[in-house]
Design a protein with these regions (language model features):
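Short glycine-enriched loop/turn motifs at secondary-structure junctions
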Residues: 1-2, 72-77, 107-108
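N-terminal beta-strand motif that seeds the catalytic metal site of vicinal oxygen chelate
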Residues: 1-17, 78-80, 130
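Vicinal oxygen chelate
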Residues: 5-8, 43, 82, 91-130
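Core segments of cupin and vicinal oxygen chelate
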Residues: 7-54
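Helix N-cap motif at beta-to-alpha junctions
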Residues: 12-13, 85-88
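Short amphipathic alpha-helices within nucleic acid-binding modules
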Residues: 19, 88-93
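Short, charged/polar surface micro-motifs in flexible loops or helix N-caps
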Residues: 50-55, 62-66, 87-88
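A short, polar/proline- and glycine-enriched secondary-structure boundary/capping micro-motif
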Residues: 67-71
Length: 130
């Protein structure tokens, strides 16, 4: 058993792909046409962080209820955790790309960590080795 995908609700597929691939360094694994439950066209977009067993399904918001949750999926808490091999290099790259970090890097018993927001405001932990 394993966790295959998590969903992140996005406003726009292409801007989300650009952020996850160009800024976070994820691989674009799939971007294909599909249909939703109401038989309306959509895209099936999956990105995956390097070395991760779990991918991220970029799900475009449909309707007011979903649009209101973009960037608020975790009710203001850190809800996503991105572990990287080289914390300092990733932090520098993301900072240079304009990512908003809410905390300075710090050391915790589980490693180096800094909290950042994705392009929609969801909070993430950037994690690295201690």
């Amino acid at each position: 058993m394993g966790l295959e995908l998590i969903s992140v609700i996005v406003k726009d597929y292409d801007e989300a792909i650009a952020f996850f691939v160009d800024v976070l360094g994820c691989a674009l694994e799939e971007d294909s046409a599909s249909l939703d439950a109401d038989n309306r066209p959509k895209r099936w977009v999956v990105v995956r962080p390097p070395g991760s067993g779990c991918g991220i399904l970029l799900a475009r918001a449909r309707g007011e209820e979903q649009e209101a949750l973009v960037g608020r999926q975790f009710a203001g808490r850190v809800g996503l955790f991105l572990r990287v091999e080289d914390f300092n290099a990733s932090y520098r790259h993301m900072s240079a790309a304009g990512v908003e970090f809410l905390t300075d890097p710090r050391s915790e018993p589980y490693g180096r960590v800094a909290v950042f927001k994705d392009l929609y405001g969801n909070k993430w932990d950037l994690l690295g080795a201690a």
